[in-house]
Amino acid sequence: NEAARHKLLDVIGDLALIGMKIRGKVTAEKPGHSINAKFAQKISEVIKADRKNILPKLDFDKKPLMDSNHIMNIIPHRPPFLLIDEVLEISESHVIGLRRVEESESWVKGHFPGAPVMPGVLQIEFMAQAGGVLVLNTVPDPENYLTFFMKMDKCKFKNTVVPGDILICKLELISPIRRGIIHMKGQTFVGDEIKSEGEFMAKIIKKDTL
């Protein structure tokens, strides 16, 4: 009947908030938008926990999908503030970027003298730039857009990053991009050791609307 069909469409629409296809069977008893949304949120939390700290094996000798020149065709950042050197993987929902942490970087002498440690804010910016590549890679004219931070949450710095490290970041969409709003989870690694992580919200805006 019409009421049952309406409820079924509500379930389908609410579960679409997960941002992934469900491979399985869903049985709904007395569904409603509120309980549907809570169920979708619970599934998203399970997916996030399952993916935590998972980084695929990477071959640093393999030619990257994008080098710095390609990256600069997508995001507006330029040296010395271009913090992502290479993109190793990219899809509609995730990106893996690489940063070679060098002795010659401007912060090395002062943060801290004799014991250089990469500032956490630069690790966040590295993840943000990788996220910018992920998002702007979805539009045909990325040179006409800018990405602005809206919010950072759950940021943690677990281990130090030092000159000589090859820093990897992995960014994943937490939910589909809607109305130019992006919600992402990011992590950085050296080897299989997690260095930092956080969740980020950003918005893409056309330059001519500023």
Question: What kind of feature is each model-predicted range?
Answer:
Residues 21-28, 53-65, 131-168, 195, ...:
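Hydrophobic beta-strand-centered segment that forms part of the acyl-chain substrate-binding groove
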Residues 83-86, 151, 156, 170-172, ...:
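Residues located in well-ordered beta-strands
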Residues 5-18, 87, 118-142:
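Active-site helix/loop of acyl-thioester processing domains in fatty-acid/polyketide metabolism
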Residues 2-3, 7-12, 153-175:
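An exposure/low-complexity boundary signal
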Residues 1-60, 78:
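Terminal domain-initiation and capping elements
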Residues 180-185:
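Short aromatic-glycine-enriched beta-strand elements
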Residues 49-117, 145-146, 161-162, 174-178, ...:
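Non-catalytic linker/capping segments at the edges of enzyme domains
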